[in-house]
Amino acid sequence: SLTKVIVTTSSIMKLIEMGKINLYDYLKEYFPELPAKKEEITIYHLLTHSSGFQAIVKLWDKDLDYQQKIKYILDLPLENEIGEVVNYSDPNFILLGELVQRVSGQNLNQFSQDQIFKPLNMQNTAYKPLANLEEISKNKIAAAEYCSFRDRMIVGEVHDENCYALGEISGHAGLFSNLNDLSKFVRMLLNKGTYNDKKILSKLTVKTMTKNWTENLKQNRALGWDLINNFRSSGGILFSDKAFGHTGFTGTSIWIDPGSELGVIFLTNRVHPSRDNVDIISLRPRLHNLIAAVLN
């Protein structure tokens, strides 16, 4: 799920900077097939997980083509009133990924490569790494777990079942990277949008993206990003109140604290050999507290 912030949120903010979209545009403008009862949903609602969509949807067992799967999501009944509840939701970011493609004319891998990864010289970051990265082989990629419907151990292909069912490129999951590349991305955000004289986002965009957009709701969210001032935050309790971050299901996380000019990238394959190990939930905040205390 680091894909949600590294690729999708960054891409949406780039499109906003380009004047292609606006945060408060109605989803209906880009998805005319959206049912009328959902016409009040905006890009803002998707980015802050306040659209009302459910947390998870099963697409991998549906005999549908790609666009039919998008329509299936659009037709899902809402679990909450629009704008009333923050409920972390994969469907939100699947739709945002499709929105990037409809507006830019490029799929997420192409758009993020052109706008983010190539300018940052992130040479080991891509969707579908075995097909899209030179000199990358399976023995250089951490294994995930055995997948029953694929009938194989997952190595070098996306772990997330829905992303796999969507062609391995989606807004909610699927990105592969490494520590060196992600450190460039984190430094770019710590430096307010610029790294090695390459401006990826404007200072104002980074500031706007990482502020609290859901103060009136029970959970604090930035645009795409999680915020530190939430109950039982994975970022712990010692980062400054400016900190923002995100986690990934397979055992990854990024936390960035502009207040102390600190970024923490934590990459594991905790789902190998099985997703049953959930100790990382308690480990993450303890790790971040330790790092914050030592370095401050």
Identify the role of each PLM range:
Residues 280-296:
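Surface-exposed amphipathic alpha-helical segments
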Residues 270-273:
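A short acidic/small-residue loop/turn micro-motif
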Residues 1-24, 93-101, 182-185, 261:
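Active-site SXXK
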Residues 37-242:
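Short, surface-exposed loop or secondary-structure junction motifs
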Residues 3, 22-37, 118-120:
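Short, glycine/proline-biased beta-turn/loop segments that scaffold the active-site neighborhood
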Residues 250-263:
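Short, surface-exposed beta-strand/loop micro-motifs that present aromatic residues
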Residues 245-248:
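Short loop/turn motifs at secondary-structure junctions and domain boundaries
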